[in-house]
């Protein structure tokens, strides 16, 4: 990890990266297994609407990944807050997070997470601990992310593809749907956007799974508003703005709900939250699922 230091954010780099990701996605689309992000657009917020979503909105989710998920008190918690504001009066959203810092998908035993009390709270009934049991189908969706550079490394990319296939099969065997979370480029390595997008789109196509285009949302945001800092000082992990942008992208991609106008802002300035909501929704609307 780099020592904390200030860093510049360059609009031109964001535009170039997003354009490159567009080119790759378009090529994959011609091959019959890709998504097509749209180019940066005006920042005016579109009217709230619904994107194409699963047949039934997930009521529960398991997040499997690394520190990109658990920074800022956990991305899953922010998604829960966004859902609570977008679905007033509906039964609560349930989630669990299985994350290990700096790890890839090959570190996770997804099968074990589906066992009774495999993951979840431990309520106590004195004097005996009663383990939670969420039944035969503890989760509706499992949102998975590999380590930030694993899909790009020649020796680790095959491991990513293998784990994507094995974990998808495990998730479906337990009655849930797999979802792949496309991670973002490092602030000082914008060229990561294109190959990461290609790797996750390919994984989604190979396994008939949805993809959350968070990496493309980051590139779009940087291109449109470089003053909104999406990273902490290490230039890799998300700032609160970065986590919020990613959570808004999950809301649109997995639940088909527009984040635009959502009252939950994670304590961010209203104008910044509105911009991030808009960028997330624009990205989701312009992204064709594999």
What are these regions (language model features)?
Residues 45-85:
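N-terminal module-boundary/linker segments of secreted carbohydrate-active enzymes
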Residues 1-11:
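N-terminal secretory signal peptides that target proteins for export/translocation
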Residues 125-240, 252:
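Alpha-helical cap/lid subdomain in secreted, periplasmic
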């Amino acid at each position: 990890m780099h020592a904390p230091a200030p860093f510049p954010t360059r609009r031109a780099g964001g535009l170039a990266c997003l354009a490159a990701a567009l080119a790759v996605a378009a090529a994959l689309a011609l091959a019959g297994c890709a998504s097509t992000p749209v180019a940066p657009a005006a920042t005016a917020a579109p009217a709230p609407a619904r994107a194409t979503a699963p047949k039934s909105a997930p009521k529960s989710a398991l997040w499997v990944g690394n520190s990109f998920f658990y920074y800022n008190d956990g991305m899953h918690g922010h998604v829960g807050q966004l859902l609570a504001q977008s679905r007033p009066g509906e039964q609560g959203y349930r989630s669990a997070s299985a994350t290990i810092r700096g790890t890839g998908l090959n570190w996770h035993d997804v099968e074990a997470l589906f066992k009774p009390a495999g993951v979840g709270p431990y309520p106590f009934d004195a004097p005996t601990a009663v383990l939670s049991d969420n039944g035969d189908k503890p989760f509706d969706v499992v949102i998975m992310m590999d380590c930030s550079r694993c899909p790009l490394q020649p020796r680790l990319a095959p491991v990513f593809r293998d784990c994507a296939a094995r974990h998808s099969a495990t998730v479906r065997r337990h009655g849930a749907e797999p979802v792949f979370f496309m991670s973002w480029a490092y602030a000082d390595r914008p060229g990561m956007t294109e190959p990461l997008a290609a790797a996750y789109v390919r994984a989604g196509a190979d396994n008939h799974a949805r993809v959350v285009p968070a990496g493309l949302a980051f590139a779009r945001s940087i291109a449109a508003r470089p003053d909104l800092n999406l990273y902490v000082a290490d230039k890799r992990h998300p700032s609160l703005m970065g986590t919020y942008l990613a959570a808004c992208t999950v809301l649109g991609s997995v639940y088909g709900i527009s984040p635009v106008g959502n009252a939950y802002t994670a304590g961010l300035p209203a104008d910044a939250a509105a911009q991030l909501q808009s960028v997330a929704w624009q990205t989701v609307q312009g992204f064709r699922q594999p």
